[in-house]
Amino acid sequence: MTTYTKLYDFFPADMFAKILDAAENGTPKTMEHPDLPLILDVDTFKNTDIHTHIDNFFKDLGYNTENSTCRLQGTKPGAEYKIHKDTPSKVVTLLIYVKGQEGTTFYEDVHGKAHITWNEGCPKADWGINPTVDTFTPNAGYWFDRNSQPWHSYENTQDTIRWVFMYNIQDIGKYESVQLNTTSK
């Protein structure tokens, strides 16, 4: 049962080159998240042709992109995102792999707990049912909406930062996605 849509060659080559360059060389706006093992740039691509490209993709699918956010996100070596579903504020989540090796693992369901929040995660003893790994391929990735959002997790077992490009459409009135707002994960 697939609850996400796989994407290939999502960005035109010139756009992906800009994103890859930012991941490899950093930007003046790159900063570490104070509570999570993340390196974020929430501003460099905001309201750019890259942001517009993604907005247009989702507008064509019928989504209102008025409250969309995008960011370059790096996960430090050794970090583990336990099994979780995204916050209810995320109407749509898009992830495009940029640089690394570790893909995202999706699960049909989870053992043991009826509800596991992003903050709590899921202990390894309660790993999910029927795991499927989405292969890390640069400029490929996936998207899902909150009506079909899957359980998912990943670990960065490599010695370097895992870089992805994230995009969310936010629900008005709900808390924001992971950025530097430490009250929302």
Feature-to-residue mapping (PLM):
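Short, Lys/Arg-enriched, disordered terminal segments
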Residues: 1-2, 179-185
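Non-heme Fe(II)/2-oxoglutarate
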Residues: 1-63
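Amphipathic alpha-helical surface "interface" segments used
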Residues: 38-42, 76, 185
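Noncatalytic linker/hinge segments flanking ATPase motor cores
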Residues: 46-47, 110, 182-185
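Catalytic core of non-heme Fe(II) oxygenases with the double-stranded beta-helix
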Residues: 66-68, 73-181
